[in-house]
């Protein structure tokens, strides 16, 4: 083989990554690969992960790294021009609709037969056991075929990450209050917070609930879920008895708007929540010392830079509304496409085995966390494993010991160990939730974040039916595209006008709003969404 290979790396990985082993007497199978470049990846062709795959499978991966800023469009142009393609194209290529379109053009091939052959899909089959559900259904296109190797990161912390509320505990204690459980209790607490000089600076600058991005913001989702299920990331769609509809056309939505408008009218929620963005206004707001009572976001005190103060925010569950509704937005960990195999590939089974090997547990960890024995180790393999602790215990035991993750992943430093998640990977909940740290090194922030994630995961406030992953055909996607932008703009602007009081919300304006939505072909979007949803649940 033309490239040198580290025997130590091979031995370290061979125990956990399953595949057939190529004969040393056979010439390597040449496979060309297209991938988007990475500023912190030295050379894909000499990368340790590449070398391991080549040695294990008896292949010669000839990799071309394209400019990441134009990668998807580059591939699209090549396909539409009928150009010869690399055997393997790594990446999501613009999403499911684009991938299905490429399949319909004959540019990429179905992999379904390989997926359902456990002798070929060795690691994918094992991954189904690891993650606890058969993700092949979520990879299946409208024609019943699977066209990509899956990428999946199950994250205990991410699934409710955009809908968690956090309260500043020193203020809660100063007010002699407890976490609110109803919309009425929340309003009363916010009234006390903004009326009291809690930070002791003699100014009336206390903020009840900080947020950004208007009705697309996390703060709005959290409040509206006291009235009806609300998830802007899924187009504000909800499902009742198998029927997909828009939350923003319901009477409960109107009640929620009236409630939130009342909070804004009293100055309990700043109107800046409707106009400011994350990078500027919101970040500046929450980094003004001791001014914010409530925040809603991925982490406790999201975007706050003071790590000690962040640790003083604790998670609060959604409140119950006057009609008894109490739900929380939920974004399930679902697979996406990590790579496809083109019709130009002369050995598609071997190309599939490359993707299959990439998703084995150890390579899936390596592509994110770095080199085993240097950046991380399995806690179970350490003599001093009991010295490591995990903030998610007892729900998840310590699984991987991390030594300097911020230097490997967060620094942007050049490395040649892994593909930095450019490739397919599959990680179960226990990996991210089982990240372990040397005893005594976890911060209060780490603990509060884990407690918040666990609180929402175990509360049981997710509706039985929700929209998660909708795979559209190219024709269906065009219908969505034609309707979505203008409709969403109208929804945002009209609801913002009601929330600020710029427009009165009454029967006349509400009915006019519903008629306008109807005139903008919302029903056409719902029709294709319903079809995609039915496919996703096997109808």
Segment roles from a protein language model:
Residues 6, 19-188, 231-236, 244-248, ...:
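Conserved N-terminal structural module of periplasmic/extracytoplasmic solute-binding proteins
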Residues 36, 363-496:
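Conserved small-residue motifs centered on glycine
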Residues 84, 97-101, 194-203, 215-223, ...:
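Secretory-pathway/luminal and periplasmic proteins that interact with or process carbohydrate-rich
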Residues 1-9:
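Positively charged n-region of N-terminal signal peptides that target proteins for export
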Residues 100, 212-236, 261-426:
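Extracytoplasmic/periplasmic substrate-binding proteins
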Residues 8-17:
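Bacterial N-terminal signal peptides
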Residues 112, 141-218, 238-284, 339-374, ...:
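Helix-loop-helix "hinge/cap" segment bordering the ligand-binding cleft or interdomain interface
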Residues 27-31, 57-61, 82-87, 105-109, ...:
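Loop/turn elements at helix/coil->beta-strand transitions in domains of secreted/extracellular proteins
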């Amino acid at each position: 083989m033309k490239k040198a290979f580290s025997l130590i790396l091979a031995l370290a990985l061979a125990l956990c990554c399953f595949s057939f082993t190529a004969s040393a007497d056979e010439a390597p199978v040449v496979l060309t690969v297209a991938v988007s470049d990475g500023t912190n990846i030295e050379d894909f062709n000499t990368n340790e992960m590449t070398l391991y795959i080549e040695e294990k499978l008896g292949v010669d991966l000839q990799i071309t790294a394209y400019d990441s800023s134009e990668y998807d469009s580059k591939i699209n142009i090549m396909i539409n021009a009928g150009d010869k393609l690399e055997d393997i194209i790594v990446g999501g290529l613009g999403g499911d609709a684009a991938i299905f379109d490429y399949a319909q053009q004959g540019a990429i091939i179905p992999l379904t037969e390989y997926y359902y052959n456990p002798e070929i899909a060795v690691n994918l089959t094992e991954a189904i056991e690891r993650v606890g559900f058969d993700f092949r259904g979520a990879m299946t296109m409208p024609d019943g075929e699977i066209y990509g190797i899956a990428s999946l990161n199950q994250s205990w912390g991410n699934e409710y990450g955009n809908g968690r509320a956090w309260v500043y505990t020193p203020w809660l204690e100063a007010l002699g209050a407890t976490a609110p459980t109803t919309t009425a209790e929340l309003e009363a607490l916010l009234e006390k917070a903004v009326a009291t000089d809690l930070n002791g600076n003699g100014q009336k600058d206390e903020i009840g609930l900080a947020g950004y991005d208007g009705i697309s913001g996390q703060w709005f989702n959290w409040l509206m879920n006291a009235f009806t299920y609300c998830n802007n990331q899924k187009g504000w769609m909800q499902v009742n008895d198998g029927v997909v509809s828009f939350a923003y056309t319901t009477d409960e939505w109107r009640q929620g708007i009236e409630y939130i408008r009342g909070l804004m009218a009293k100055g309990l929620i700043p109107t800046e929540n409707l106009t400011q963005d994350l990078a500027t206004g919101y970040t500046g707001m929450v980094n003004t010392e001791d001014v914010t009572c409530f925040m809603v976001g991925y982490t406790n005190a999201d975007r706050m830079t003071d790590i000690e103060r962040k640790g003083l925010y604790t998670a609060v569950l959604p409140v119950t509304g006057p009609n008894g509704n109490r739900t929380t937005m939920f974004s399930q960990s679902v697979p996406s496409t990590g790579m496809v195999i083109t019709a130009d590939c002369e050995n598609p089974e071997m190309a599939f085995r490359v993707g299959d090997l990439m998703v084995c547990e150890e390579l899936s960890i390596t592509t994110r966390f770095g080199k085993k024995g240097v950046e991380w180790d399995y806690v179970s393999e350490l003599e001093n494993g009991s010295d490591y602790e995990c903030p998610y215990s007892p729900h998840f035991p310590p699984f991987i010991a991390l030594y300097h993750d911020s230097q490997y992943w967060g620094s942007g430093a050049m490395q040649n160990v892994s593909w930095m998640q450019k490739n397919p990977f599959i990680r179960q909940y226990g990996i991210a939730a089982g990240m372990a740290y040397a005893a005594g090194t976890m911060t209060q922030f780490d603990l509060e974040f884990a407690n918040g994630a666990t609180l929402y995961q175990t509360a049981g406030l997710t509706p039985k039916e929700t929209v998660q992953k909708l795979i559209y055909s190219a024709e269906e996607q065009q219908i969505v595209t034609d309707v979505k932008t203008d409709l969403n703009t109208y929804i945002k602007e009209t609801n913002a006008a009601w929330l600020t009081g710029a427009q009165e919300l009454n029967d006349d304006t509400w009915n006019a709003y519903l008629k306008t939505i109807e005139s903008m072909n919302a029903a056409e979007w719902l029709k294709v969404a319903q079809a995609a949803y039915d496919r996703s649940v096997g109808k």
